[in-house]
């Protein structure tokens, strides 16, 4: 037990030692310029292998340089090289300012490197320290101001921070969520959006537009933390308070924020994305992205690319296309053709089956759709019903009947004479991708007639609906969308039977059935 106690004491002494050393040097640096060289020792702790030493030194450096910036003790303007200090005729004061400015730059570089440290506490401390520098530099600029702009903001520092947050090798989602607090500041948000746009273009072009999953996931996480205010009057929260209000400051204009937001997203979506990311973007598309777009048409290329991926992503992409088409009267002639081609046997066996039929019901709800188009959907669904499981059929049959109710011209598919009774060739072409060329209106719903002999009583009962005139009131299929085979079996097992069948065939006469062995060999006279 003794060695353990000695170890704890030694560790405690080490902690006291480095804290005392850093605090002492911090006080000396701030009290007297002759101790300027002590800054090297404090900065060196930023490269320590011990997490606690880095955190303590980071806070010390933040205190030192924020105070020096506020005092005006750092060189302002284009920084001369340190090698040139001995050559020029500069005062001791000016040399001190240049020296400390170089040390400040070194400190910032190390803090930015620590944003990618393996310890989250180090990352968070470094992030907060850099943002303190952003706020301090905003109030006391280290660059000569361009007075044509009349405002100041350390854009280069924000750009450097964003580049480290958008790592190509490390998932930074946790730190980005911490950074969201700073994104509530209107000026920070604006310059971050500009920086994201620049960093995304630089990295993607450098990698020849190839998919970079980690980097693109970091960009997506940062983009989703950005919330644009609804009204210009809400934009009053700034990290850097300007000396006076300026109408030409873009960071203070809601219109400029929306423009930067739009440009940032469009640039990000221009490149090929990891397959899983399309679904994430499509989920937030309507609530978070489209409302800030000046023209919904700008998203058409992305949505078309998402459709080509297939599966649930294709369906979500069509949903994304439907809103601009429906609400903004945008023309997209291939929309229903693409929806039509999503109808295949696999649709009954995927997890998103309920969502598919829910959205398909919305897409086909308009009574102004051409009759040939609705007939094509009705016929394709009818053909697919021949191989569909009972749970899917209980959705399909009411769905088909609802389509016919909305479009009475499609009743010709039901009432085509003798189509189900006489052998004939079905003119409908199942393999045709264009609903206008599949000849659905020339066919009939013989498939539904066939399902009237289905082994499941609920299915056969639902199929007999087309034998009677359809009511004007549509059936509610919402409760059927999530129906499972287990629920169907439970329903059958719990149901009360009025009669119990004793034979496969109903007995009518004694010993007269040709299927009974006794009836074949014996006859009653």
From Swiss-Prot:
- GO biological process assignments: ribosome biogenesis
Keyword Transmembrane helix attached? yes
The keyword Transmembrane helix is assigned to this record: yes
A GO term from the CC aspect: small-subunit processome
Similarity comment: family membership: Belongs to the CBF/MAK21 family.
- Give the residue spans that cross the bilayer: 305-325, 356-376, 384-404
Gene symbol here is: noc4l
Q: Where in the cell is it found?
A: Nucleus membrane; Nucleus, Nucleolus
UniProt cross-references to Pfam families, sorted A to Z: CBF (PF03914)
- InterPro entries in alphabetical order: CCAAT-binding_factor, Noc4
Name the membrane topology term. Multi-pass membrane protein
Keyword annotations: Membrane, Nucleus, Transmembrane, Transmembrane helix
Q: What is this protein called?
A: Nucleolar complex protein 4 homolog
């Amino acid at each position: 037990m003794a060695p353990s106690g000695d170890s704890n004491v030694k560790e405690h002494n080490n902690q006291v030692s480095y804290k005392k050393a850093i605090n002492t040097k911090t006080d000396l640096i701030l009290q007297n310029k002759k101790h300027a060289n002590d800054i090297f020792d404090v900065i060196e702790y930023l490269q320590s292998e011990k997490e606690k030493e880095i955190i303590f030194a980071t806070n010390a450096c933040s205190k030192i340089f924020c105070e020096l910036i506020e005092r005006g003790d750092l060189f302002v303007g284009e920084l001369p090289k340190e090698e040139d200090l001995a050559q020029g005729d500069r005062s001791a004061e000016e040399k001190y300012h240049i020296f400390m400015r170089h040390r400040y730059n070194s400190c910032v570089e190390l803090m930015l490197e620590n944003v990618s440290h393996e310890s989250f506490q180090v990352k968070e401390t470094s992030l907060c320290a850099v943002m303190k520098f952003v706020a301090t530099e905003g109030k006391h600029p280290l660059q000569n101001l361009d007075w044509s702009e009349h405002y100041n903001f350390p854009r280069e520092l924000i750009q450097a921070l964003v580049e480290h947050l958008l790592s190509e090798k490390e998932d930074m989602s946790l730190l980005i969520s911490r950074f969201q607090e700073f994104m509530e500041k209107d000026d920070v948000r604006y310059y971050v959006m500009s920086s994201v746009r620049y960093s995304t273009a630089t990295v993607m072009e450098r990698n020849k537009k190839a998919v970079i999953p980690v980097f693109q996931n970091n960009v997506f996480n940062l983009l989703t933390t950005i919330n644009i205010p609804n009204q210009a009057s809400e934009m009053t929260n700034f990290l850097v308070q300007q000396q006076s209000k300026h109408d030409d400051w873009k960071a203070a204009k809601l219109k400029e924020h929306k423009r930067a937001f739009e440009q940032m997203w469009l640039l990000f979506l221009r490149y090929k994305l990891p397959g899983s990311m399309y679904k994430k973007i499509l989920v937030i598309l309507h609530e978070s992205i489209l409302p800030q777009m000046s023209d919904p048409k700008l998203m058409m290329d992305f949505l078309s690319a998402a459709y080509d991926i297939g599966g649930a992503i294709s369906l979500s992409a069509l949903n994304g296309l439907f809103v601009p088409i429906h609400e903004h009267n945008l023309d997209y002639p291939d929309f229903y053709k693409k929806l039509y081609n999503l109808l295949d046997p696999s649709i009954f066996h995927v997890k998103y089956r309920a969502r598919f039929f829910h959205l398909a019901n919305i897409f086909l709800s308009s009574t102004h759709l051409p009759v040939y188009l609705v007939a094509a959907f009705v016929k394709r669904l009818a053909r697919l019903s021949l191989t569909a499981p009972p749970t899917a059929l209980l959705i399909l049959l009411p769905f088909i009947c609802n389509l016919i109710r909305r479009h009475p011209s499609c009743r010709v598919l039901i009432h085509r004479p003798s189509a189900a009774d006489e052998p004939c060739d079905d003119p409908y072409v199942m393999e045709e991708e264009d609903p206008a060329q599949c000849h659905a209106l020339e066919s009939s719903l013989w498939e539904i007639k066939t399902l009237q002999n289905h082994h499941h009583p609920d299915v056969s009962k639902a199929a007999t609906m087309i034998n009677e005139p359809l009511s004007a009131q549509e059936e509610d299929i919402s409760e059927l969308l999530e129906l499972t085979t287990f629920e169907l079996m439970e329903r059958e097992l719990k149901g009360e039977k009025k009669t119990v069948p004793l034979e496969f065939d109903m007995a009518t006469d004694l010993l007269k059935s040709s299927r009974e062995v006794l009836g074949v060999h014996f006859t009653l006279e």
